[in-house]
Amino acid sequence: MDPQLPEPEPLIALIEALRRLPGVGVRSARRMAYHLLQHDLQGADMLGRALSGAVQHLRHCARCNSFTEDEVCATCANPKRDPGLLCIVETPADQNMIESSHGYRGLYYVLMGRIAPLEGVGPRELDFQRVIERACDGVVQEVILATNFTAEGETTAHFLGDALSERGLKVTRLARGVPAGSELEYVDAGTIAWALMERRST
């Protein structure tokens, strides 16, 4: 006996589409679908139109690879940004986090991923040649590698760091330290050790 009640094809299609979101399993997708259809039809319509509009009108910036409606995004076109600094991040979300710190006024390049051999993602899939060409435009003086401190992020930073250093660019890496406001007993030993080694006078 089939334990799953039969569902209409449009509902199945919606659930499968929602499952494509990161961290969303079939149960969560089904709950979201039921909620939208039962309690928020207006929201469902807004979501559909917004997603369709984003797919149709957004593209990758010719300079930084982030999302934009125009050929060059507003950040890259901003004359107040420092063109000599280029910060390389994995995703637009990472870019937004760095921007929200208000401590960086240079430009960005968004990889839209990281090297992940088990997922079949390597330098070619991330178009590293384009990254290198962007960094070697004759204006950039320093490249800041701001990939995540995961195994994949470290591999990505190492690969890019070697490639860019060979071309005479100054390459730096985001420092890892004890997060502001945290208590040392709750910070892992590796982070504390690294923070001690990288300590500097204040």
From Swiss-Prot:
Protein keywords: DNA damage, DNA recombination, DNA repair, Metal-binding, Zinc, Zinc-finger
Zinc finger boundaries on the chain: C4-type: 61-76
Ion transport found in the keyword field: no
Pfam families according to UniProt: RecR_C (PF21175), RecR_HhH (PF21176), RecR_ZnF (PF02132), Toprim_4 (PF13662)
GO molecular function, one term: DNA binding
Domain called Toprim: residue spans: 84-179
UniProt cross-references to SMART domains, sorted A to Z: TOPRIM
Stored InterPro entries: DNA_Rcmb_RecR, Rcmb_RecR, Rcmb_RecR_Znf, TOPRIM_dom, TOPRIM_RecR
Entry's Gene Ontology BP terms: DNA recombination; DNA repair
Family: Belongs to the RecR family.
PANTHER family found in the cross-reference section: RECOMBINATION PROTEIN RECR
HAMAP family: RecR
Function according to Swiss-Prot or TrEMBL: May play a role in DNA repair. It seems to be involved in an RecBC-independent recombinational process of DNA repair. It may act with RecF and RecO.
Name recorded for this polypeptide: Recombination protein RecR
The species this protein was found in: Bordetella parapertussis (strain 12822 / ATCC BAA-587 / NCTC 13253)
Gene, per the UniProt record: recR
